[in-house]
Amino acid sequence: MKILHTADWHVGKVLKNQPRIDEQKLVLRDLVRVANDEDVDLVVVAGDLFETAAPNPQAQALVMHTLMALREGNRQVVALAGNHDNQKLVQEVYAPVLGQLGIHVIGTPRRPDSGGTLTLDTRTGERAIVAALPFLSHRYAVRAAEALLHDQSQHNQDYANKMRGIIELLCRGFTADSVNLVTTHATLLGGRWGGGERAVQTLLGYEVPPDVFPASTHYAALGHLHRYQEIGGPCPIAYSGSPIALDFGEEANQPVALIVHATPDSRAHIRPVPLTGGRSLATLRGTLDEVVAAGAEAGEAFLRVILTQKASAGLADQVREKLPNTLDVQIDEKFRARTDSTVTRSRIGRTPTDLFADFLAEREVEDPRLGAMFAELLEDST
């Protein structure tokens, strides 16, 4: 069986006021091309279809059309909700509508007999059993454990054990003569965030160990971390990463789709296939003259410029005039006057999440976990 694994599309992403939708149209068109060229039997989209919980019509249309294009040729398609997605919208609107076209969409955790475990017969006659678990926050993990496991004693266990129990339940239908797959949107211990090579450290107990996946799993298709990577465990495990570099912390990432070959009696083989269409990102650091000189080598990349000189009137405008692809101009902290704060951005029309992202960017904090934590705390408080 040939499987295409992708995740973290984040359709509707806006980077420093620059919409990425045109790039996303190109890269998702390329993703469909890969599915066709590779003649895959099954496509798995492991969460974060959208950038926000309230995607605009253009973003929704792109996701819908891409999923339908992937379905062409009678290939099976499975798509999950991630932490950026509106899970109720995905479950109550997209799942029934796209389900009429044979596309399997899972927005909220389901019991095995209600869509949590899918038995899919491919066009080649092979059978896949897919245990599908959308993103689970702490507060929903307790609720999901109660609904799926019917065990009140589970409520006091930590997040990882709740995930383990739910995944074990969803995998009970695995058989010896099927290709057994797990797909979820989660953070595994040992994974690396898209913005650097740091080992993921425990943060609010969200990480789960790779051994939550049973050894009978032929392949675990993950979403949430934006860098392509394989994780050691009892079965082949991989993150496909995002098909475009979403932020400047991810500028070194190489966008790919994963082609996975799996049979009931062999270990899955994973092969990354490069995706095109997204513009690269680059950070230039130096004086005005230095970054302008370096910009000649940056091509069409979107730029973040960090100036190692004192601020002066019109400096940012000079940068943008000489480097039109510049999205962000900062003064290196060493050159900022003690009384000088970073440029105040207008709050009109900007969400608290946007303002917090600006706050992190101004301090060169590149850790997507903080943004996710802020968004969850904001949701809990409103």
PLM features: what roles do these ranges have?
Residues M1-M68, E72-R75, A372, E376-T382:
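N-terminal active-site segment of His-dependent metallophosphoesterases
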Residues T6-A7, V43-D48, Q76-N83, H104-P109, ...:
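Active-site neighborhood of phospho(di)ester-bond hydrolases with catalytic His/Asp-centered motifs
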Residues H10, V40-Q58, R75-L89, L188-L204:
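Active-site neighborhood of divalent metal-dependent phosphoester/pyrophosphate hydrolases
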Residues V14-K16, L49-T66, A81-L101, I106-G107, ...:
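Metal-dependent catalytic neighborhoods of phosphoester/phosphodiester hydrolases
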Residues D37, L42, H261-T382:
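Accessory, non-catalytic peripheral segments of nucleic-acid enzymes
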Residues P96, Q100-L203, T263, P274:
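Conserved catalytic scaffold of divalent metal-dependent phosphoesterases
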Residues G99, L188-S266:
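Conserved beta-sheet core of the metallophosphoesterase superfamily
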Residues G116-A128, L133, C235-G299:
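Binuclear metal-dependent phosphoesterase catalytic core
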